């Protein structure tokens, strides 16, 4: 991040007002099409800076060092690269990408808020506490797929703190994006929340169970070792190390704001798969 004079770093009142309007419009769009807003409302306007570029390798990137989100120009209004396209004009897949990146920004915000940069760290958010517990006991040692196309060929890896945090962060963001995409798919063009239509809620649950059983909620990490990074830029987790069921329930409750009776029904639909090594640490879906 470029150094600049202190006075140049202070936004004008017009800048602040403009940022607040953009964020208010995003929240309003999300509410109108019945999408989750719980974690979005916890993000202060202006925390994340959104940019657009012609991205060729990835649909989006998030840079926590300067809280910057880079989206493909296709997610901008008229593909002009100046402002975010109205959410109602985005496809379900585009909204999946957007929510994935916005969740990265949310976790970044929680981490920054926790950091005692002024000597007085804010008490850790419950979701962040839960994340730290999961990082320690689920993402410290993982199974990976060295060859992505061969999902059954796996290897064990001991991850560094940086690698395990990225693996968790990406895995959780994959689920958040998936949850939003599939909510839009089951709601169709009815503009009615799936929580008010039992048939839609059941359809989402069926999709979730199928995705969970197929091991679709898997993140990745970038190896810290330079020699390994010369071989591959990303290591993808294997199905054995995908998102845990308890993690999904906590994210539904604390990040997405799903209704508790919906979460309880979904939990009851799963046969007991044994105790989670982290189930009693850091938080739960209340």
For each of these PLM feature ranges, what is it?
Residues 109-155:
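Post-HEXXH active-site segment of zinc metalloproteases
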Residues 101-122, 172, 179-187:
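Catalytic Zn2+-binding segment of zinc metalloproteases
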Residues 74-99, 108, 160-164:
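Short pre-active-site segment immediately N-terminal to the catalytic Zn-binding motif
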Residues 13-21, 27-29, 88-97, 163-167, ...:
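Soluble non-cytosolic domains of exported or imported proteins
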Residues 14, 179, 183-286:
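Pan-zinc metallopeptidase signature
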Residues 15-78, 112-129:
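Auxiliary, metal-adjacent structural segments of Zn-dependent hydrolase domains
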Residues 136-189:
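Metalloprotease/metallohydrolase-associated module, dominated by Zn2+-dependent proteases
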